[in-house]
């Protein structure tokens, strides 16, 4: 880290400590929209970022209507991204549970987003082509625990009657899941765009609470720093692009 960047970061942390005007910051963009990069930006800005695996573990209970673990988790840090914040309409609950918070909707070109989803998942299973991904790959994934990824994936994209509410697809039965839609581009992009639009509608009239940003094209953290009320000196800090797929 060069001396100038170190000074900018120190100024940001000092500003947050002395005059922070918000409660929490939630990255609510879907997976593969720059959420890892956003976590790095939060750290650069002097925010304590919630542990991602701990956050993912709260998804399981929150989908079933139990928010106690999610609340306890959020109380112990400043900024969050990925699951469960990238899922469905959890942003509505967060807005009610943590007043005066800020929300960042990370977006990217829908076609690029879908290709990134396929590449990431194929790589996870050692496949050369995303078209080789099967229901069995998803169901047998051991990440967190067996069944975690299958539930999350089905919940996000494969519901027979998708309403994108924060409930568990598995609670309404396996027959509610349309596995034949697995990585169907049109279905996935529709779900992606539908959720983004629901976020925009919910925060309409509250521009101070929602920032929408394409992390793949942003060259600096200027927009995020301005949104959080950080010093102008951070406007030239480069965007720390991470985990590209």
Give, region by region, the residue ranges found by the protein language model.
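Intrinsic-disorder-associated interaction segments
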Residues: 2, 63, 137-138, 217
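PAPS-dependent sulfotransferase catalytic domain
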Residues: 2-188, 194, 198, 205-208, 219-226, ...
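Intrinsic-disorder/low-complexity, polar/charged segments
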Residues: 66, 185-187, 244
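The conserved 3'-phosphoadenosine-5'-phosphosulfate
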Residues: 54-62, 104-115, 133, 177, ...
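Conserved short-loop catalytic and cofactor-binding motifs
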Residues: 26, 187, 212
């Amino acid at each position: 880290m060069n001396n100038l960047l170190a000074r900018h970061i120190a100024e940001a942390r000092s500003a947050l400590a002395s005059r922070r005007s918000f409660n929490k910051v939630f990255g609510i963009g879907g997976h593969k929209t720059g959420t890892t990069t956003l976590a790095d930006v939060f750290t650069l800005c002097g925010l304590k970022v919630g542990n991602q695996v701990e956050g993912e573990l709260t998804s399981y209970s929150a989908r079933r209507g139990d928010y106690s673990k999610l609340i306890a988790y959020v109380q112990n840090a400043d900024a969050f991204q990925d699951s469960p914040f990238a899922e469905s309409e959890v942003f509505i609950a967060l807005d009610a549970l943590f007043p005066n918070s800020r929300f960042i909707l990370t977006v990217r070109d829908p076609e690029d987003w879908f290709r990134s989803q396929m590449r990431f998942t194929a790589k996870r299973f050692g496949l050369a082509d995303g078209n080789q991904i099967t229901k069995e790959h998803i169901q047998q994934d051991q990440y967190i625990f067996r069944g975690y990824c299958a539930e999350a994936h089905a919940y996000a994209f494969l519901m027979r009657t998708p309403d994108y509410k924060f409930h568990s697809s598995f609670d309404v039965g396996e027959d509610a899941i349309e596995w034949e839609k697995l990585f169907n581009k049109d279905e996935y992009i529709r779900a992606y765009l539908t959720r983004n639009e629901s976020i925009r509608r919910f925060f309409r009239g509250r521009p101070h609470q929602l920032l929408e940003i394409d992390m793949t094209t942003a060259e600096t953290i200027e927009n995020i720093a301005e949104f959080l009320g950080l010093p102008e000196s951070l406007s030239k800090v480069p965007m720390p692009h991470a985990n590209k797929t």
